[in-house]
Regions:
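Short beta-to-alpha transition helix within the HATPase_c
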Residues: 48-65
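Conserved micro-motifs of the catalytic ATP-binding
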Residues: 41-45, 79-82
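A residue-level detector for a conserved hydrophobic packing site
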Residues: 87-88
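Conserved catalytic submotifs in the C-terminal HATPase_c
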Residues: 69-82, 110-113
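Short alpha-helical Gxxx[C/S/T] motif in the catalytic ATP-binding
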Residues: 151, 156, 160
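Conserved glycine-rich
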Residues: 168-169
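Short conserved segment of the HATPase_c
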Residues: 127-141
Length: 171
């Protein structure tokens, strides 16, 4: 149905109206993809051995080629057992948030006693201390002024947390 709606919008003559409706349709598509990703998280993909460093580097390269300001700080191979598509989704959500609120993302992997941490850093305003738990609740968005400027559904960080916890990690 979303593709049919997108095709029909091409016939709307009012350019401003068409562009606004296209943006709404884009948001609906992102919401749909995120809800489906969350539903798949309950089952679906089986864990397998991958190189976390290569996985994250590939994602950063793809985003960089699409014009996203992403800096990847190379890491030696980092073998882990995970559901790679979920990990890619979580890192992508973090990078997209960093770019939306901090205008760029610096991504790196660090070795820890338990394995590896993926760090996504930006120069944005940060999340206020008293909002740091609430931001992981479904459909929660902070500051309405930021909502209009950055778009989004309020599911990105919810998915990040669910994926991290599903892999024995944390955000």
């Amino acid at each position: 149905p979303l593709t049919a709606m997108r095709i029909n919008l091409e016939f709307v003559n009012d350019e401003e109206l068409r562009d606004g409706l296209m943006r709404n349709l884009d948001e609906l598509q992102v919401l749909t993809e995120q809800v489906l990703a969350a539903a798949k998280g309950a089952g679906g993909e089986k864990p397998r051995q991958v190189d976390l460093s290569a996985l994250v580097e590939s994602l950063c390269t793809d985003l960089d080629e699409m014009g996203e300001p992403v800096n990847w700080n190379n890491h030696s191979p980092a073998p882990i057992s995970c559901r790679p598509n979920e990990i890619k989704r979580a890192v992508r959500n973090l990078v997209e948030n960093a770019v939306a609120y901090g205008h760029k993302a610096d991504v790196r992997i660090i070795d820890t006693a338990d394995g590896y941490d993926v760090l996504v850093e930006d120069e944005g305003p940060g999340i206020p201390e008293d909002e740091r738990q609430r931001v992981f609740e479904p459909f929660v968005r902070l500051e309405s002024s930021r909502n209009e400027a950055t778009g989004g559904t309020g599911l990105g960080l919810t998915l990040v947390k669910a994926i991290a916890e599903g892999h024995g990690g944390a955000v």
